[in-house]
């Protein structure tokens, strides 16, 4: 339904600008319809893969999940700090998506041209969050509810088709295909949090050393590890974090969240050869975001001390 709607509205405008409409789906998280939308709209399969997996796993996930969920869970003290971290992560977003795009097989010239709308949207988000945070958050929540509603309708239609054999929407993927992807995500999730816990125990001393160097306590350094598994535990722990820890962990979530969990499981289920591009893009973008947040907080704390 979304694909058909875009075909008659925004897609002609994209083609007029010589941009591949496959990039449009990148505003949705890859596992919330972004990947399928990119693949359906793309003129070049490589652009569909890049938009659906790399952009959808970073910018799309931030728009449809991380921001609305984070702002809904956090208190008044944490919200401005969380927003500052998201701004830092968005500033570093080009690093992650360019690395991922190159590993998807795109030339640097094509990558830069096709990514222009993504960069523009990231700039608009940065301006909006810094100047009109309350209005932006309300907009994100409404957008997320629309996506959830569309997903619920899709599940209902898929279930009806599965039980009756009547295909109401010929272009819609079958329920069996969707459940296969969900199973792949579930299998990866089974071991992801235990994996993060094992890493925390094995790397306790190195993590403490890194934390001392960048000014993070135990909870802050643990959040950087848990964040690559899931955003939810990290956001929940932010109520107990200090300012620097909140900002740096929020910055990581823009590109790094679910890197070794839901996003990895999804890509293994739909396009396994793109796994390397996904991991490299999310890792480099996440590290760049944390570094950007670290620099911002050093300047903020330095100016405060004067």
For each predicted feature, which ranges?
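Hydrophobic core segments of alpha-helical transmembrane domains in multi-pass membrane transport
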Residues: 1-3, 90-101, 117-131, 149-162, ...
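Interfacial loop-to-helix junctions that mark the boundaries of transmembrane helices
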Residues: 106-116, 139-144, 172-181, 273-280
């Amino acid at each position: 339904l979304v694909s058909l709607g875009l075909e008659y509205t925004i897609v002609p405008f994209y083609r007029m600008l010589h941009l591949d409409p496959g990039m449009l789906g990148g505003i949705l998280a890859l596992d919330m319809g972004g990947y399928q939308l990119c693949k359906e709209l793309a003129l070049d399969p490589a652009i569909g893969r890049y938009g659906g997996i790399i952009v959808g796993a970073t910018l799309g996930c931030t728009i449809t999940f991380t921001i609305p969920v984070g702002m809904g869970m956090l208190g008044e003290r944490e919200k401005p700090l969380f927003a500052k971290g998201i701004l830092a992560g968005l500033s570093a977003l080009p690093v992650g998506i360019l690395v991922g795009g190159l590993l998807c097989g795109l030339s640097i010239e094509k990558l830069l041209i096709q990514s222009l709308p993504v960069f523009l949207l990231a700039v608009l988000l940065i301006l909006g969050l810094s100047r009109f945070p309350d209005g932006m958050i309300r907009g994100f929540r409404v957008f997320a509810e629309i996506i959830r509603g569309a997903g619920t309708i899709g599940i209902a239609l898929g279930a009806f088709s599965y039980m009756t054999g009547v295909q109401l929407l010929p272009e819609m993927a079958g329920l069996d295909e969707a459940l296969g992807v969900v199973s792949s995500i579930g299998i990866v999730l089974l071991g992801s949090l235990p994996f993060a816990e094992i890493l925390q125990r094995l790397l306790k001393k190195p993590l403490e050393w890194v934390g001392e160097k960048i000014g993070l306590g135990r909870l802050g350094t643990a959040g950087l590890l848990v964040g690559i598994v899931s955003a939810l535990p990290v956001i929940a722990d932010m109520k107990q974090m200090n300012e620097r820890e909140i900002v740096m962990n929020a910055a990581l979530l823009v590109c790094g969240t679910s890197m070794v969990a839901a996003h990895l499981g999804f890509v293994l289920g739909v396009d396994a050869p793109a796994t390397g591009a996904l991991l490299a893009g999310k890792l480099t973008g996440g590290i760049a975001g944390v570094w950007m947040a670290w620099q911002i907080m050093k300047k903020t704390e330095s100016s405060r001390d004067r």
